Curated annotation (Swiss-Prot):
Record function comment: Responsible for the release of ribosomes from messenger RNA at the termination of protein biosynthesis. May increase the efficiency of translation by recycling ribosomes from one round of translation to another.
Biased composition (Basic and acidic residues): 141-159
Name by which UniProt lists this protein: Ribosome-recycling factor
Keyword Cytoplasm: yes
Entries under CDD domains matching the protein: RRF (cd00520)
Annotated gene: frr
PANTHER family listed in its UniProt record: MITOCHONDRIAL RIBOSOME RECYCLING FACTOR PSEUDO 1 (PTHR20982:SF3), RIBOSOME RECYCLING FACTOR (PTHR20982)
A Gene Ontology molecular function term of the record: ribosomal large subunit binding
């Protein structure tokens, strides 16, 4: 029973950290990253569609993303969606290929990106604390129902705290790595 609580806690923390990594992949660092385009939707015959479902997205150079639509008639729609996104990119159309040069980030923009990164990290830590609270409540209810002894419950709570500390440390490592990427010129 207690093993299930700990297992569920670990899974919840892993999901929170995976969500953090996905969110951070979309944050601009000054280097080209195909995941930057994940949040952009293109109007495809009246349906908002992710670019990756309409085109091949590649990173041929460190500061260039290339987008090759599978249907040539969608080039203008994809260009418009990229231009209107809040990424600050200026698409260059070359026949049926869209090139996205990634401009270097200004110092001010880098600071904004670091703030956003820290906010994402803090949100992840809040989610981890919520998982800890849920696990502790489950342990308390098992103890109250008489399914586990007080000593077992105390050991399980200690284990919960250790798992949470491990998860929080991993979040700090992920955030520090992303901040380093952003601040590297």
């Amino acid at each position: 029973m207690l093993e299930d609580v700990i297992k569920e806690l670990r899974e919840g923390i892993e999901k929170a950290i995976e969500a953090l990594r996905r969110d951070l992949a979309k944050v601009r660092t000054g280097r080209a990253n195909a995941a930057m385009l994940d949040g952009i939707r293109v109007d495809y015959y009246g349906v908002p569609t992710p670019i990756v479902q309409m085109a091949t997205v590649s990173v041929p150079e460190p500061r260039l993303i290339s987008v090759k639509p599978w249907e040539k008639n969608q080039v203008k729609a994809i260009e418009k969606a990229i231009r209107e996104s809040d990424l600050g990119l200026n698409p260059q159309v070359d026949a049926d290929l869209i090139r996205l040069p990634i401009p270097p980030l200004t110092e001010e923009r880098r600071r904004e990106m670091v703030k956003l990164t820290k906010k994402n990290g803090e949100d992840c830590k809040v989610a981890i604390r919520k998982h800890r609270r849920d696990a502790n409540e489950m342990i308390d209810s098992l103890e109250k129902d008489g399914d586990v002894s007080g000593d077992e419950a105390d050991r399980a709570k200690k284990k919960v705290d250790d798992v949470v500390a491990e998860g929080t440390k991993l979040v700090d490592t992920v955030i520090a790595g992303k901040e380093k990427d952003i601040l590297d010129v």
